């Protein structure tokens, strides 16, 4: 193992020259090189122990270089024999200089590439290929090698002996080496190797040395502080990425989130990131961002910070996890790290990207006119399924909303969107304004905010609350008028007064009714079928606008309940048509179910209205050559001419 890691020192260039000599017979050169510092060093080398400090001693270099390419292979070979280091150990002891090289090299020599190849890169590739096979977890991260590259010789010799004893003591488990190396690993990627062996505690001595080595290396000066942190780092094994990613904000974050000791170290800039995340196991990335601003001022108590962030954030469950002692969160963190921002399954993950989308996403969903029902159902499912179950703590949700919601009042806008998006939720916006308002404080915020699935969860509760109103609203709300409902809903949400909300809700639905695009479409087809003759006559008369518009009228009168809906609906329909129902140029408006241009219709040759208008326009066949008509027709089609459309000509 050591060979592999120390190999990077080749980058130093001192050894770069040697490889050419050594390449032909790595074994010979290794024997020749008498640079082994001491018996202890030789022994350790035989064992395959690599000391971060000993990166550049020529003695070590020999095996290293040969092994550079197969670096991991020897590792796997050596590692398996941790319990029985004797092969290497005995060999090393018996013939210290030659044996270590022999034992380590024989396999590697086969592998070794001509000296010319840049070893570090090869090693990286090899490690990538072998990684995860024999190496102890600590070896797995590729990052460690770079630091050794920066090692200085002074570290190597003095440190090798000093570190040698600890490895021997702990030698029996292969981890000791890993652990010893772990300081380096951890420094580089505190958690990349979720260290299966937390021997770091036992290895405290080596870790400190490793820390010093790291400083000497300058490999990861920022992480140098992690020497002490390494132990917490073990618990925070999964947080390596976070360390790197959050490093800038980490010092600030750690003090609030990490335990005091962690906080101090965090200021060090060492494992602080790890500390932060371990301490607040369930912190969501959003919360981290939120806390980012906090750092300038204060290290708030861990519990307070996470809880405040969560409350602002809408995470009820997180608070518990975060406030817990770092150790507990650390365990969670170990599970968590893969998605650093998610929380452990138990906790409701209030990602702020979940809560924030509540506003925009709401709008988007509503505009998309995804079924009112579909939207809420989808949201609830998404949260409950993969992320953990928000549903279980609906009560908590309600209670939490009280404190949490007030701040995010800015999310209120989505509220009016709510009525629109769903039959399920629309009940909410209207009735919640109505009934939840009586339970004033918490419920009022929900209407305003209703950001997370939290509301959707209570949603089930809400429907019972106002069954009558809810149903009415849901019926009306399929697509609340985009514009009006927002204004109305805004009134609803902000104004707790129950009356305004219901009244507003009721008026809005009629307005919105013309809008319902999805449902009416199907209805339209049927209705058209039923009264097709009559309608066809109407159209022939040119009573109404183009097909879509008339259809809107027809639909609207039902919801508006007005025969007079015809004209009024016409306008609404016009808006609808303009917005949603662009008829494609040749789409058949009221065609037979077959959608064919055929005589099934009372008015036969039912081409798209603009086409039929052109065709039916009185043409002076003598005066206007056919190509003129063609041009006009094609122009209208290309432009999808609304204005040329029957709106103008259609009276014929």
From Swiss-Prot:
Interacts with FANCL, GGNBP1 and ZNF403/GGNBP2. Residues 491-652 are annotated as: Interactions with ZNF403/GGNBP2 and OAZ3. Disulfide bonds: none annotated. Transmembrane segments: none annotated. Residues 18-30, 124-133, 538-552 have a biased composition (Basic and acidic residues). The keyword Calcium does not apply. This is Gametogenetin. Residues 213-230, 251-267, 299-312, 407-422 have a biased composition (Low complexity). Coiled coil: none annotated. Residues 123-486 are annotated as: Interaction with GGNBP1. Pfam families: GGN (PF15685). Keywords: Developmental protein, Differentiation, Phosphoprotein, Spermatogenesis. Residues 138-149, 163-178, 428-466, 495-513 have a biased composition (Pro residues). Residues 201-212 have a biased composition (Polar residues). May be involved in spermatogenesis. Residues 523-532 have a biased composition (Basic residues). The lineage of its organism: Eukaryota, Metazoa, Chordata, Craniata, Vertebrata. GO terms for molecular function: ubiquitin protein ligase binding. It is linked to Spermatogenic failure 69: An autosomal recessive male infertility disorder characterized by low sperm concentrations, globozoospermia, and absence of sperm acrosome. Residues 1-39, 52-237, 251-273, 291-473, 488-576 are annotated as: Disordered. The modification Phosphoserine is found at residue 389. One of its GO terms (biological process) is gamete generation. The keyword Nucleotide-binding does not apply.
